[in-house]
Amino acid sequence: MPDPSLSAAIEEAYASAPAGEVIIHTLEFRHPSFTTPLRVVRDKQDITATLEASAPIDASTAVTFVAFAFDLELPDVTTGPSPELLITIDNVSREVLVYMDQAANSSDLIEVTYRPYLASDLSSPQMDPPLTMVVRDVEADIFSITARCGFGDFANKPFPRDVYDLTRFPGLLTI
């Protein structure tokens, strides 16, 4: 199933794999307890790339993504069950542990934004809007951390959203 959020340039790169065109995978982790977002790139060197105009932090600004070793499994583009993004980090560094410790002491969820770039064009992400999910589950052992990310739990949201109680709606009281 085609993904309408991808740019024509990255669709061509996926389809024909032209020589010299490299897809750069970036992740941005946001949490209320983080002083700054954690931005990483799956590469051996840091990159500076421009965020999209709708970015929640530093919109349309050139930011640095820190080189980091991670693996990711992108969600399928299907109409089936809720898609999941899997992120695996081996040999977790101290920098990441600081962020993980900050988030562990909070009930707020970590938001993750995946942005693919082309090495030849770092002026904007090649997916608009980028894929934004929340971390649902984290598994850790002495060698790696695996995070399962998904969209919000829409199936268990109350509908209608308003809770009709006597405080806000005193007319509900019957005599």
Model regions: which residues?
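Ubiquitin-like/PB1-type beta-grasp interaction modules and other compact soluble beta-rich domains
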Residues: 162-175
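Beta-strand elements of well-folded, non-transmembrane domains
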Residues: 91-93, 116-120, 139, 153-155
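Ser/Thr- (and often Asn-) enriched beta-sheet segments in non-cytosolic proteins
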Residues: 23-28, 69-71, 86-88, 111-113, ...
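Extracellular/virion structural assembly segments
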Residues: 72-114
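A glycine-rich, hydrophobic loop/mini-helix early in the fold
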Residues: 45-86
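Short beta-strand and beta-hairpin "edge-sheet" elements
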Residues: 121-150
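Polar/acidic, low-complexity leader/linker segments enriched in S/T/G and N/D
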Residues: 1-61
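Short solvent-exposed strand/turn elements
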Residues: 143-165
